[in-house]
Design a protein with these regions (language model features):
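Membrane-interface aromatic/basic loop that binds lipid-linked glycans or pyrophosphate carriers
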Residues: 2-69, 123, 343-403
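Short beta-strand/loop segment that forms part of the nucleotide-sugar
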Residues: 89, 113-122, 141-145, 172
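Glycine-rich, basic loop-to-helix element that forms the pyrophosphate-binding segment
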Residues: 145-162
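Donor-binding/catalytic cores of nucleotide-activated saccharide
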Residues: 172-274, 283-298
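Catalytic core of nucleotide-sugar-dependent glycosyltransferases
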Residues: 280-286, 293-321, 333-366
């Protein structure tokens, strides 16, 4: 829907004028689709089957596939009816912003009872001392995982101790706005949703706030179900029914892009997903964060490997291979993988592309008719099906306009 489109969000953030934002978004989408149609007809660079196999064989040498914890995850602990929301905070070398993060959680304008689970993941700065101080406050528990090394494992450690009816994830360099908990719970009460996505705002390392990202007041059910792919796959900024994580954990071996599991494993298990317009979260653009620093390194190929992980998990969980599944798979292999590897050398980008095409081919026969999918997904699907490297790059660059 246009309200969720990036152009709409940016214009709304700058002007506060909803009609103007919608008009610009409609114009941007129309222009983007026209450009995609024209350029997509001429910018072909198709790979042969032999080229796909040759390039794909290079992938393990560039970035080996991460190894995740084997077996079924432990059951979630019993729910404590006295706890409304469990807030999980993975912490790794976050001393600079950690106090602001924890204070934003503890000083919420709410009478709800919160369980704050701060997971100390092998920090080498002063984060441990700060956490020891906050651990003396009521409702704050500091956890030390036996095996750490990733935000995925840290979040999983928190889930293993979470007893609230609802779960929030907050990164240690980010903050909740003062009314975040009440805003999200109120939206849940109105809609009956299992997941509620709130708005968020950029914040730099000097605490200067930037563009606001807001979403429609909407429930993504029935005809709107596929619009849920417009919501970000980030763990933060959302309220989750805790039971959605039964048998589901973040892929522990991944140091980046582990949040793909939100779209692949968590969203499909929700009967109703809603979004609400108010901003509830400040996301700090950390230039030294794992995602930012990985996109120009070989680790960016984890964006492909995690797709394999997601498909294996979907089979294990018995999730339907329906239109939403197809959208998630195609967009992961096309748009998202392209964005993640765009900063790599050309040969490595081609390796990622070849892997994506071959994985799509293995699943294509199980997916619904692509003609039933949204335009942006159909364009991405065509790039994968035809092994068209030129179109794959084009749709990746234009996705924010054509979606």
């Amino acid at each position: 829907m246009l309200q969720n489109q990036r152009a709409c969000q940016l214009v709304r953030s700058k002007t506060g004028c909803e009609p103007l934002a919608l008009a610009v978004a409609w114009g941007a989408r129309t222009a983007g689709r026209c450009a995609a149609g024209v350029l997509g007809a001429v910018k072909h660079q198709r790979f042969s089957d032999q080229q796909l196999e040759t390039f794909a064989a290079r992938a393990p040498g560039i970035c080996p596939k991460p190894v995740c914890d084997a077996g079924e995850p432990c059951p979630l602990p019993p729910q404590d009816d006295a706890v409304d929301v469990s807030v999980i905070v993975p912490v790794h070398n976050g001393e600079r912003f950690l106090r602001a993060c924890l204070d934003s959680i503890l000083h919420q304008n709410t009478t709800r009872r919160l369980q704050v689970l701060a997971v100390e993941d092998g920090s080498t700065d002063g984060s441990g001392a700060i956490l020891a101080e906050y651990a003396r406050q009521e409702g704050v528990t500091v956890l030390h995982p036996e095996q750490g090394g990733s935000a995925a494992r840290a979040r999983n450690t928190g889930l293993a101790r979470a007893v609230g009816r609802w779960v929030l994830f907050v990164d240690c360099d980010d903050c909740l706005l003062p009314d975040a908990v009440e805003t999200l719970l109120a939206a849940q009460a109105r809609t009956g949703a299992d997941i509620v996505q709130g708005g968020w705002q950029y914040c730099d390392e000097a605490d200067i706030r930037g563009a606001v990202q807001q979403y429609a007041e909407a429930c993504y059910t029935g005809p709107r179900r596929l619009d849920v792919v417009e919501l970000p796959g980030t763990p933060w900024g959302k309220l989750y029914r805790r039971t959605l994580f039964e048998r589901v954990r973040f892929p522990s071996g991944y140091t980046c892009f582990e949040d793909a599991m939100i779209h692949f494993w968590v969203f499909p298990r929700a009967k109703c997903i809603a979004s609400t317009k108010p901003v509830v979260y400040l996301w700090r653009k950390n230039t030294m964060g794992l995602t930012a620093t990985s996109q120009n390194t070989a680790k960016a190929l984890q964006a492909y490997w995690v797709a394999e992980e997601m498909l294996d998990g979907a089979v294990r969980l018995g999730l339907p291979q329906d239109a939403l599944f197809a959208c998630n798979l195609i967009l992961q292999l096309a748009n998202y993988c392209y964005v993640c590897v765009a900063g790599l050398p050309e040969a490595d980008r081609q390796t990622a592309f070849a892997c994506c095409c071959l994985l799509y081919r293995r699943w294509a026969a199980k997916l619904p008719d692509p003609r039933t999918l949204p335009y942006a997904v159909r364009l991405a699907q065509r790039a994968l099906e035809q092994a068209d490297y030129g179109l794959w790059q084009l749709q990746g660059r234009l996705f924010q306009l054509i979606n």
